Amino acid sequence: MGDEGKKPEDTRRRPMVVSKGWVQGIALVMILGFTVMGILAYHTYNDSIPIPDKVVSTTGEVLFTHDDIVAGQEAFNNRGLMEYGSIVGHGGYLGPDFTADYLRRAATLTLDVRIKARENQPHQANIKDWRTNRYDSRTGVLVLSRQQTAAYHHLVSYYTTYFGRNSHNLGLLADDIKGPAQARHLTDFFAWTAWGAAADRPGHSYSYTNNWPADPTVANRPTADMVVWSVLSLIVLIGGTGVMFAIYGRWSKNIGWHESETPSLSFIPPSQVGLTKSQRATSWFFFVIAVLFLFQTLVGAAAEHYRADISSFFGFDLAAWLPYNLARTWHVQLALFWTAAAFLAGGIFLAPFVSGKEPRRQHVLTYVLLGAVAFVVFGSLTSEALSVYGVSWAKGPVFGQQWEYIDLSKMFQ
């Protein structure tokens, strides 16, 4: 009796509502786009800042090693600091860009030493010191000058205090970095990125990061190539969009300049549209999407509150429970999750209309996919929280947090 009012599943083959030309065009764009992205990724990894085997002073003192830099990077990721500050200009911005912060502080310290020593043209000497590349690719050894070494030791102490017991006043957990060893590794990581941002790339007059971040203390200014390619990219983007519309307007028979007649639109009442089982199953997707969107809004509001009052939430110590880096991590991840879930649900719902048919038992796979989405969402949010809180086993490549936008751990990636 309960099945009498239920509409039978529509299994008839329907005509495609999208022409094959559009499908082929999208496929071509995707192939070309991913090819270009692959080429850029190849050059990014091959032309990136080299990680020296060891960094030494002019007296031969080993300041830090390759493993120390990697350990600092892992600590930076695991504690969610990418969602608090940034590195080489990429990340969250409640905190500083630690590359720029280290570079400015260290360069100012080395300049002050030269001014106090009454060196001839201290500003030019300071610029030359920072832009000189003392990395030997054959031995893997990077040598820091006497002034840079002194600045490094000073900043180890500074960042140890920065991430110490009073870090809750910065929107982080108190004692966010566990112990002086981890703070030193973080400083090693910052120092390495600052060196790469200032030292000239071999054979060129600009740094490994194209003189970014900008800092007049070390003569980090935009290069001519950077300006030219930035302008050209804007011209191609805007001009290419205009050319695309011009071509479509010239040859389209529906909405172009020479259309034969105005196309008429007709809509089928929703009550007359037969839905498949998988299309009905997507209703659960949209319910989950709404819940994720609501949660994203709430944690986003908490993250923005830190910009108004970084030390408390109407008298409540919010950083002790939901530090800024965790709130922003969840905010960014939830935006990606509900958007991805919406694309999945939209694809499942529209596929039968586009293809004209639906594979048998696809609704079962739809529920399996919904379960997989739930596992990834709740599992990754939990692992990110454990990573930020510094739980000993929730770190490293398996459970630890990663770079911004791909914060979810390898376990759920």
Predicted regions and their residues:
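Post-cleavage N-terminal segment of exported redox proteins
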Residues: 2-64
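Membrane-interfacial, low-structure loops and terminal tails that flank and connect transmembrane helices
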Residues: 2-17, 254-282
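Hydrophobic cores of alpha-helical transmembrane segments in multi-pass integral membrane proteins
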Residues: 22-43, 76, 84, 203, ...
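Membrane-interface interhelical loops and short amphipathic "cap" helices
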Residues: 45-66, 90-94, 107-110, 210-223, ...
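Soluble extramembrane regions of membrane proteins in the secretory/endomembrane system
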Residues: 46-226
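Extramembranous, membrane-proximal N-terminal regions and early juxtamembrane loops
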Residues: 176-220, 226, 267-305, 312, ...
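Flexible loop linkers connecting adjacent transmembrane helices
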Residues: 256-269, 319-327, 349-366, 393-400
